[in-house]
Amino acid sequence: MILLNSILVAFDFSDTSISALNYGRNLAHAFGGRLHVLNIADVISTSAAQFYPEGPGDPEAKATALALSQLKTILAAENAPEARPAVRVAPDPAVAIVDFAKEIHADLIVIGTHGRTGVSRILMGSVAEHVVRTAPCPVLVVRPAEHERSEEHTSELQSQR
């Protein structure tokens, strides 16, 4: 029998991660598991936190607090108030996701993929692919809707001209 006591959703505020959240929420509900939702704040983007109107302070702490607040808002809007939100600052999202999965003893990781191909995949890499290769548990990869993939593919072709 499959037990999903602890489910981790990797969340990057994209439409695909909303879909991943819905999968994770439904699985947690069906299996009676605990739902964890993790956002990895980019180290570079935390430097922009120094410009927040709250004044001076630790930019990393401000960026983390802002991401956590936004994450809680989305969880409430997506009918996942029981989810346990978390934000980590890390230079490598894939490593941070796998480390967090180990920390919470995740039975499943749910992650969206942006479906990049070609040059953009080579340049940006694939967080989902790295998580699949290194995760301590099974990984459910949620693909973007067909229209999202076709829009991204079109913009990629246009950028190659």
List each language-model region with its residue ranges.
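A short acidic, glycine-rich active-site loop
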Residues: 55-69
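Single conserved hydrophobic/aromatic residue that forms the stacking wall/gate
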Residues: 152-161
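General small-molecule cofactor/ligand-binding pocket signal
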Residues: 36-38, 84-88, 140
